[in-house]
Structure formats: C-alpha cells, structure tokens
Amino acid sequence: ETFTVKMGGDAGTLQ
C-alpha cells in the first residue's frame, strides 16, 4: 500500500 501513502495515506482513500 505504498502508492496509497503518497496519494492519501489510507488504503481506503484509494477507492
């Protein structure tokens, strides 16, 4: 889930 960290920081935010 490293890509989610740069976008929002939460895996749930990745949609």
Curated annotation (Swiss-Prot):
It comes from the Bacteria. One of its GO terms (cellular component) is plasma membrane-derived thylakoid membrane. The keyword Kinase does not apply. The keyword Membrane applies. Its cofactor is Cu(2+). It is a peripheral membrane protein. Belongs to the plastocyanin family. This is Plastocyanin. The gene is petE.
